[in-house]
Amino acid sequence: MIVKLMGSNKDLHRQAKNNNNKLTPNRSLKETRSRLYIIRRCLVMLLCWREPRD
């Protein structure tokens, strides 16, 4: 449903590819920090997850 609203996958990939060349250093740093934050949160969730006891 989201893809239909935003366009096809090819269009999104093409836009992302074109935008990568135009990233300012500040925006690039922000994206990198965001990705690292998400990875860190996923790792913590995986490491701290436990089976519920019945």
From Swiss-Prot:
Cysteine-cysteine disulfides: none
The organism's place on the tree of life at top rank: Eukaryota
Positions annotated with a glycan in the UniProt record: N26
Transmembrane segments: 31-48
Any one of the GO CC terms: plasma membrane
Span list, region Required for DVL/RTFL small polypeptide activity: 20-51
One Pfam entry name: DVL
Subcellular localization: Cell membrane
Membrane topology: Single-pass membrane protein
InterPro entries for this protein: DVL, DVL_RTFL_regulatory
Keywords of the record: Cell membrane, Developmental protein, Glycoprotein, Membrane, Transmembrane, Transmembrane helix
GO BP annotation list: negative regulation of cell population proliferation; shoot system development
Function description: Small polypeptide acting as a regulatory molecule which coordinates cellular responses required for differentiation, growth and development, probably by restricting polar cell proliferation in lateral organs and coordinating socket cell recruitment and differentiation at trichome sites.
Similarity section: Belongs to the DVL/RTFL small polypeptides family.
Protein name in UniProt: Small polypeptide DEVIL 12
